[in-house]
Amino acid sequence: MPSPGVLTRAAVLSVAALAATITHATEKGMPTTAAGVQDFGAGFMPPTTPFGTVGMRISDYQARVIKDSHGKDNGNDFNINVLAIGLAYLRMTDQQLLGARYGFGAVSVFFRMDADLGIDAGGQRVFSDSAELFRPADVQLIPLILDWRPAPGVGINTQLSIQAPTGDYDKDRLVSPGTNHWTVSPILNASYISPSGLELSSSFQLDINARNAATDYRSGVEYRHEFAVGQHVGDWTLGLGGYYYRQLGDDDAPGLTRGNRARVLALGPAVSFFQPTSGLPAIWLHAYKEFEARNRAEGYTVALRIGASF
C-alpha cells in the first residue's frame, strides 16, 4: 500500500491543479477552459482540515503557428504568449453524499497576454493587429466535489465546475482573458498508485458552452483527457504527462459554414516533490509540447503549481 505521505502529496495536488482557468474561446481558436491542469494525483482530494486548502498555479503558454483543418500552418504571421497566475481555494468536509466526502471550491486567475497577428495576400500585408494586457479572467465556481476512496491506493472524484463571464472582454480586441459566456464542465478524475509506487492518473472533462451575446458565437462541446504516468521515488514523482483535447460539436455563428472543430495532443516530462513532515508546500512542474493541432494554435506550455492544507 502507498505510504500516507504519497497519498497526501497526491491530495494536495488537487487544489493546486484548480488554480488555472480559461485561455480564449474556441471562436478565437483556443479552448474555453485551461488544458494541462491535472497530472499526478488527479483522483485524490485533500483531507478535511479546519481552514481548507489553497493552491497557486503559474503557467506560460507560447505559440507561433496556427494550424488549419489539415494540420498545416495557415501561413499567417502569428505569435501569442499567455502568462497565467491562478489562485484556488478548496474546502473538503466530512459530510457524506452518495458515499463520498462533499467539498466545494473557487478559482480566480489573472492573465498577461501578448499577441500579434499579420495576414498577407498577394505579397502585401492586408491585416495586422496586436494586443498586450494584464487583466482578470473568468471566475470558476465549483459547487460540487465528491471524493471516494474505494480501495488502497485508489482515488476517484467527480466535480461540477461553472465558469462565469466575469473576466475582462472586448470583442474588437485580438485577445481577451474573458470569454463573455457561461461554461458548465462536468469532470471525472481517477488515480491509482501501486504498492511499488507506480502511478496512473487521468482526468476527463466536458465543456458545455453558452452563446457569446456580443458576437452571437457559440463554441461546440469540448472534451479533454489529461493524464500522467510516473514513479514515486522517495519524496519525488517522475514521469510523463500530457493532454488530449478535441472539440466534439461544431461551432455555431452567423455566416459560419464550417464547424471549426479543434483538436490537439500534448506530451512532456512531469515531476513533483513533497516532504510531508517538512511543513513545505507540495510542488509540481511540467513542460508540454503540443502536436497534431487542427483549427487552433500549436505551441508549448510550462506550469508550476504549489498547494497546502491548513
Predicted regions and their residues:
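Outer-membrane pore/translocation modules
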Residues: 100-103, 109-218, 259-261, 276
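Transmembrane beta-barrel strands of outer-membrane/channel proteins
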Residues: 31-34, 54-62, 104-110, 158-164, ...
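Cleavable N-terminal export/targeting peptides
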Residues: 1-32
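Short loop/turn motifs that connect adjacent beta-strands in outer-membrane beta-barrel proteins
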Residues: 26-27, 43-51, 93-103, 117, ...
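Residues that define the transmembrane beta-barrel architecture of outer-membrane proteins
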Residues: 50, 79-87, 133-140, 178-184, ...
